[in-house]
Swiss-Prot record:
Keyword terms of this UniProt record: Aminoacyl-tRNA synthetase, ATP-binding, Cytoplasm, Ligase, Nucleotide-binding, Protein biosynthesis
Motif ('HIGH' region): 11-21
Protein name, per record: Methionine--tRNA ligase
Originating organism: Mycobacterium bovis (strain ATCC BAA-935 / AF2122/97)
Pfam family, one: tRNA-synt_1g
GO BP terms, alphabetized: methionyl-tRNA aminoacylation
Family: Belongs to the class-I aminoacyl-tRNA synthetase family. MetG type 2B subfamily.
Binding site for ATP: 302
Catalysis performed (reactions): tRNA(Met) + L-methionine + ATP = L-methionyl-tRNA(Met) + AMP + diphosphate
InterPro entries (alphabetical): aa-tRNA-synth_I_CS (IPR001412), Anticodon_Met (IPR041872), Met-tRNA_synth (IPR014758), Met-tRNA_synth_2 (IPR023457), Methionyl/Leucyl_tRNA_Synth (IPR015413), MetRS_core (IPR033911), Rossmann-like_a/b/a_fold (IPR014729), tRNAsynth_Ia_anticodon-bd (IPR009080)
Amino acid sequence: MKPYYVTTAIAYPNAAPHVGHAYEYIATDAIARFKRLDGYDVRFLTGTDEHGLKVAQAAAAAGVPTAALARRNSDVFQRMQEALNISFDRFIRTTDADHHEASKELWRRMSAAGDIYLDNYSGWYSVRDERFFVESETQLVDGTRLTVETGTPVTWTEEQTYFFRLSAYTDKLLAHYHANPDFIAPETRRNEVISFVSGGLDDLSISRTSFDWGVQVPEHPDHVMYVWVDALTNYLTGAGFPDTDSELFRRYWPADLHMIGKDIIRFHAVYWPAFLMSAGIELPRRIFAHGFLHNRGEKMSKSVGNIVDPVALAEALGVDQVRYFLLREVPFGQDGSYSDEAIVTRINTDLANELGNLAQRSLSMVAKNLDGRVPNPGEFADADAALLATADGLLERVRGHFDAQAMHLALEAIWLMLGDANKYFSVQQPWVLRKSESEADQARFRTTLYVTCEVVRIAALLIQPVMPESAGKILDLLGQAPNQRSFAAVGVRLTPGTALPPPTGVFPRYQPPQPPEGK
């Protein structure tokens, strides 16, 4: 099996997770599941970034030890991922012992390359962004200095720190971007990065002495690594680094895909490849920066009180329903918006009507009229062959969309086919054919139900990465054994005569809770 290594960004556990975190995890999980079903040996890494000033300050404000807050909040992130059915292979925490060793080895390699030196740093620092800013990237607003880009407050910092010779990598980075046009996606982010790097790069401060919550610099324990040096290294740690001779590292590095938010593209597409070039380590193959998820078009924030809790949402509406909505509603890579009305519409229109109702109606007819067994079809008419051909061609189209991280287009293609299937079912009128005493009509009845069940099967196979539990239930209803559920089974038709279990509904319509009478 061909290996495939995919990662999410690791989240800061300084506050509770929100639906924006869930969006990235669900998208990456869908890709990991797709690759597994498509015959790949997948390694899927996610986790939390427990170091940095942001976490230390949150702990101080809460009056708890930093390690305790980081551990407690990381547990919340891990439980959220488990609640959303995220199929990670490792949930890494940057406090893990093997991660400290990996970070120190990366530092040693960059130092041995002559790319690290000691100097004095003075400039503006944003704790919230864990990022340095030059004067021209800030502005005074009502007496407070804020970053122009993110609007977060900055403080003036002066200390002796180690620097990384980022300036030496300007041309090498640009050469890599041009030689590997798919390295950064989508195109808008790629253009942003190329524009930024083309302007020339300054050396980067990569250690701090003003606090001690982080990975200690080798041979210089009074310095801790700048949180992004340590954080980015997690992708190497997850592949077994620094043991580059290990089976894990040789099999999975370089990473095939880093899935991140657009706000951290500079760290991943500029700093990270420069660190790896310095250390003599192969670069990841692709970095995809997705957009932000807003609430009714507004940025989610605690101060506004419009943050959506993904676990509460899943408990109210269903895990698979939330997973489907987030990947279907928003063109992946662009900003998108959440609203209660939009998700209920998707549940009732796409899931309950288009897929759930089609499966329920066809399987109920099979149970009632054909002894609960897959019907034996007659000769396929043009309408049958056309619908089957559309369904048969879906895997290649869906694969292409997943490889481009365009899950919304993959789902759109599947639902277009389901729209065709519903029209086909209405035109063929199996409920009329069933009552006919004509043998030809009975053959059409069996053929119509066979074709409908077959295209529902193909749809269920292909939606497994997005809705694993619900797709599994549909495949159960179609009598598909566990070894008939990989994408290799797409072209293997339903076997006539297969006994099917009694049909049950998979996607109930969502009815909002009614207030008690008299209220």
